[in-house]
C-alpha cells in the first residue's frame, strides 16, 4: 500500500515518521519542490524503520505517486510579515492550482487528504480544483481539536481519553465549536458522569478546557514555531482508516452542501471514513447555542472561500 506526501516540511515529515511508527503503509513517497529536503527526510526516516515497521520510505517526484491510494497534501507557503490572511490564502490557492492536477495525473484514484492550513478553506479549494467527488477530498479538520478536547476532559474526570466521546465541529480555528451538550463518557452523559465521579464541571472548568483546546496551537507556535507531531499522528491515523476501510468516525473537513442554512462550505463534522474517503456525515445533537455557533463558523469559512473565488 503506497502513500504519497506532497510537502516535506514540518507536517509532511512528521506524518511520514508517524506512518512508519504506526506501520500504516508499505511504501511512503515524499515529494517536495526542495528535492534535497525531501531526500534528507526520507533517508532519515528510513533509518528508523528497523526500530519500527518495514516501510520503504523514499523521495520522488509526482510521477512516483502512481498507484498511491492516499496522497497527503501538506504543501503551502509561510505567511510573510505584514501579509493578510486572505493574501496568504491566495498564495496557497496558487500552490494548490499547481500541485493538485499533478497529483491526480499520477494517482487519479487516490483519496486526497488535505493538511495545509487554513485546512477547511484549502479543502474547498482542492475540491474545486480536482473535479473529484467531494468524499475523496478530505481535510484533517478538527481531528486534533477533538483529541485535545477529549484529553482535557479525561484529565479532569480521571478517566482514559479513549472512553470519552466528545467532538469539536466547524472550523479548525478560532470559530470552532466544542460540543458539550452531547458529550459522553462510557455511554453516560457528561454531567451525570462528572457528578458520579465527584469531578463536577464548574463554569470555570469549562472555560479552562475551552481555552485549552482553542488556544493550544497558539501556545505551541509561540514556544517552538509550529505544530506538527500531533497533526502528523492524526494524519497517519486517518490514512490507516482509509487504507483498511475501517469505517471509523472522525471529525474531518469536507465540502458539504448545507450546514445550518449555510450552503456549499467545507468544515468539520463527525464523518465515517473508509476506503473511498467519507462514506457518511453524522450530525451530532446540538443545543441552540452550539447550533448558532456552528452557523457562525460556517459563515466565516464560506466568506473566506468566496473571497478567493472558490
Curated annotation (Swiss-Prot):
<feature type="binding site">
    <location>
        <begin position="115"/>
        <end position="117"/>
    </location>
    <ligand>
        <name>NAD(+)</name>
    </ligand>
</feature>
<protein>
    <recommendedName>
        <fullName>L-lactate dehydrogenase</fullName>
        <ecNumber>1.1.1.27</ecNumber>
    </recommendedName>
</protein>
<feature type="binding site">
    <location>
        <position position="32"/>
    </location>
    <ligand>
        <name>NAD(+)</name>
    </ligand>
</feature>
<keyword id="KW-0560">Oxidoreductase</keyword>
<dbReference type="GO" id="GO:0005737">
    <property type="term" value="C:cytoplasm"/>
</dbReference>
<feature type="binding site">
    <location>
        <position position="150"/>
    </location>
    <ligand>
        <name>beta-D-fructose 1,6-bisphosphate</name>
    </ligand>
</feature>
<dbReference type="InterPro" id="IPR001557">
    <property type="entry name" value="L-lactate/malate_DH"/>
</dbReference>
<feature type="binding site">
    <location>
        <position position="140"/>
    </location>
    <ligand>
        <name>NAD(+)</name>
    </ligand>
</feature>
<feature type="modified residue" description="Phosphotyrosine">
    <location>
        <position position="218"/>
    </location>
</feature>
<keyword id="KW-0597">Phosphoprotein</keyword>
<feature type="binding site">
    <location>
        <position position="227"/>
    </location>
    <ligand>
        <name>substrate</name>
    </ligand>
</feature>
<dbReference type="Pfam" id="PF02866">
    <property type="entry name" value="Ldh_1_C"/>
</dbReference>
<feature type="binding site">
    <location>
        <position position="62"/>
    </location>
    <ligand>
        <name>NAD(+)</name>
    </ligand>
</feature>
<keyword id="KW-0021">Allosteric enzyme</keyword>
<feature type="active site" description="Proton acceptor">
    <location>
        <position position="172"/>
    </location>
</feature>
<keyword id="KW-0520">NAD</keyword>
<feature type="binding site">
    <location>
        <position position="85"/>
    </location>
    <ligand>
        <name>substrate</name>
    </ligand>
</feature>
<feature type="binding site">
    <location>
        <begin position="76"/>
        <end position="77"/>
    </location>
    <ligand>
        <name>NAD(+)</name>
    </ligand>
</feature>
<dbReference type="InterPro" id="IPR015955">
    <property type="entry name" value="Lactate_DH/Glyco_Ohase_4_C"/>
</dbReference>
<feature type="binding site">
    <location>
        <position position="79"/>
    </location>
    <ligand>
        <name>substrate</name>
    </ligand>
</feature>
<feature type="binding site">
    <location>
        <position position="11"/>
    </location>
    <ligand>
        <name>NAD(+)</name>
    </ligand>
</feature>
<dbReference type="InterPro" id="IPR036291">
    <property type="entry name" value="NAD(P)-bd_dom_sf"/>
</dbReference>
<comment type="subunit">
    <text>Homotetramer.</text>
</comment>
<feature type="binding site">
    <location>
        <begin position="145"/>
        <end position="148"/>
    </location>
    <ligand>
        <name>substrate</name>
    </ligand>
</feature>
<dbReference type="InterPro" id="IPR018177">
    <property type="entry name" value="L-lactate_DH_AS"/>
</dbReference>
<dbReference type="GO" id="GO:0006096">
    <property type="term" value="P:glycolytic process"/>
</dbReference>
<dbReference type="InterPro" id="IPR022383">
    <property type="entry name" value="Lactate/malate_DH_C"/>
</dbReference>
<comment type="function">
    <text>Catalyzes the conversion of lactate to pyruvate.</text>
</comment>
<dbReference type="Pfam" id="PF00056">
    <property type="entry name" value="Ldh_1_N"/>
</dbReference>
<dbReference type="InterPro" id="IPR001236">
    <property type="entry name" value="Lactate/malate_DH_N"/>
</dbReference>
<dbReference type="GO" id="GO:0004459">
    <property type="term" value="F:L-lactate dehydrogenase activity"/>
</dbReference>
<feature type="binding site">
    <location>
        <position position="165"/>
    </location>
    <ligand>
        <name>beta-D-fructose 1,6-bisphosphate</name>
    </ligand>
</feature>
<comment type="pathway">
    <text>Fermentation; pyruvate fermentation to lactate; (S)-lactate from pyruvate: step 1/1.</text>
</comment>
<feature type="binding site">
    <location>
        <begin position="117"/>
        <end position="120"/>
    </location>
    <ligand>
        <name>substrate</name>
    </ligand>
</feature>
<comment type="similarity">
    <text>Belongs to the LDH/MDH superfamily. LDH family.</text>
</comment>
<dbReference type="InterPro" id="IPR011304">
    <property type="entry name" value="L-lactate_DH"/>
</dbReference>
<keyword id="KW-0963">Cytoplasm</keyword>
<dbReference type="GO" id="GO:0006089">
    <property type="term" value="P:lactate metabolic process"/>
</dbReference>
Amino acid at each position: 500500500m503506497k502513500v504519497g506526501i506532497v510537502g516535506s516540511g514540518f507536517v509532511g515529515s512528521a506524518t511520514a515518521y508517524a506512518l512508519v511508527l504506526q506501520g500504516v503503509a508499505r511504501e511512503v513517497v515524499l515529494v517536495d519542490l526542495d528535492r534535497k529536503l525531501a531526500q534528507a527526510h526520507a533517508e532519515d526516516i528510513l533509518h528508523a524503520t528497523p526500530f519500527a515497521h518495514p516501510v520503504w520510505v523514499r523521495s520522488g517526484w509526482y510521477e512516483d505517486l502512481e498507484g498511491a491510494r492516499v496522497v497527503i497534501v501538506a504543501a503551502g507557503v509561510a505567511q510573510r510579515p505584514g501579509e493578510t490572511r486572505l493574501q496568504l490564502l491566495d498564495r496557497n490557492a496558487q500552490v494548490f492550482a499547481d500541485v493538485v492536477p499533478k497529483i491526480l495525473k499520477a494517482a487519479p484514484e487516490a483519496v486526497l487528504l488535505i493538511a495545509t492550513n487554513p485546512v477547511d478553506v484549502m479543502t474547498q479549494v482542492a475540491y474545486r480544483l480536482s473535479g473529484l467527488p467531494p468524499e475523496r477530498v478530505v481535510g484533517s479538520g478538527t481531528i486534533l481539536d477533538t483529541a485535545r478536547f477529549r484529553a482535557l476532559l479525561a484529565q479532569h474526570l480521571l478517566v482514559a481519553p479513549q472512553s470519552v466521546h466528545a467532538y469539536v465541529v466547524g472550523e479548525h480555528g478560532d470559530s470552532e465549536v466544542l460540543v458539550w451538550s452531547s458529550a459522553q463518557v462510557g455511554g453516560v452523559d457528561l454531567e451525570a458522569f462528572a457528578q458520579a465521579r465527584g469531578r463536577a464541571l464548574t463554569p470555570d472548568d469549562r472555560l479552562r478546557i475551552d481555552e485549552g483546546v482553542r488556544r493550544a496551537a497558539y501556545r505551541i507556535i509561540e514556544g517552538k514555531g509550529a505544530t506538527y507531531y500531533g497533526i502528523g499522528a492524526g494524519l497517519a491515523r486517518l490514512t490507516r482508516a482509509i487504507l483498511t476501510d475501517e469505517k471509523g468516525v472522525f471529525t474531518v473537513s469536507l465540502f458539504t452542501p448545507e450546514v445550518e442554512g449555510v450552503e456549499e462550505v467545507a468544515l468539520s463534522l463527525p464523518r465515517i471514513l473508509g476506503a473511498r474517503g467519507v462514506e457518511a456525515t453524522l450530525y451530532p445533537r446540538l443545543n441552540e447555542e452550539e447550533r448558532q455557533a456552528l452557523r457562525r463558523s460556517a459563515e466565516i469559512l464560506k466568506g473566506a472561500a468566496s473571497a478567493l473565488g472558490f
